[in-house]
């Protein structure tokens, strides 16, 4: 009986050895095999100490949610949902006008429609709230908003004496029928000279805009004499009526983000009267004291992340090869690289025309920041 059991046991051992050899031949098992080892997803793995840049692109978009903003592409939908959450959690602590502004923005995003005139007016009314939230958060930003050119000129005299930089969103024309806003980046130099770089998100050649720049230059000369230099950079990223308030706020913040570049431009403007040796777009305007430059020739790619049109990105790429592939992600929470081309695709909507709604998502984000600050 015992002999019979031993024979059966040896037979089983031989069978096990044969099975192991068979599986090894398939690459399964053994210390060197990895085909069936447990896989740890990258997102759950500890980050590499050598990692300095984010992955090139995010995973595929999640399927449309059942939220009230499901008509929007994934990226702007998430920003709308984040604003909606902020209204619910922080709205009772915020100024009523800011809450109404947030709700009007959410309503526009929910309908997935172009910006209305009433929302543009709310941009103007609530701009001080948005400006304050950023100025309180960013060191030495010195961001202000001005409802008239006269208010800006009056306050500029005070800043002129401090020697501090100033960034501002300024209404370009005294005419109450004209709402257009632009961003001003200002440096007050030790020599007593002041340099101003105006950032026009649309076209400075627009007949409704250029008279404001010429008049501003005249008033600056009257106030400061020869101790003032004034440049205008037209980005032509804004292609729709309205939107200038949020665009200009974004440009003031972008100038702060790119302040080392702007510091050098201001030095050039003070010492040489030009920026990077670039010739003005219009000799006639230059004779009037308005040094006009084309934005696609020199502005960093970050200034075009909210551009409405593919054509604008193509022009930027033609003037600055490689710019359309530049990583323009922002914020501490940014995980993936984001090129201008990819952003244009991810924020594209089809309404009366096909264009990027990135600036609308930026409005939602800026309002959320104001609610949470």
UniProtKB/Swiss-Prot annotation:
Its EC number is 2.3.1.-. Residues 29-89 are annotated as: Disordered. Coiled coil: none annotated. InterPro entries: Ser/Thr_acetyltransferase, YopJ-like. CoA binds at residues 180, 239-240, 308-311. Residues 43-54 have a biased composition (Low complexity). GO terms for cellular component: extracellular region. Belongs to the acetyltransferase YopJ family. This is Serine/threonine-protein acetyltransferase AvrRxv. The lineage of its organism: Bacteria, Pseudomonadati, Pseudomonadota, Gammaproteobacteria, Lysobacterales.
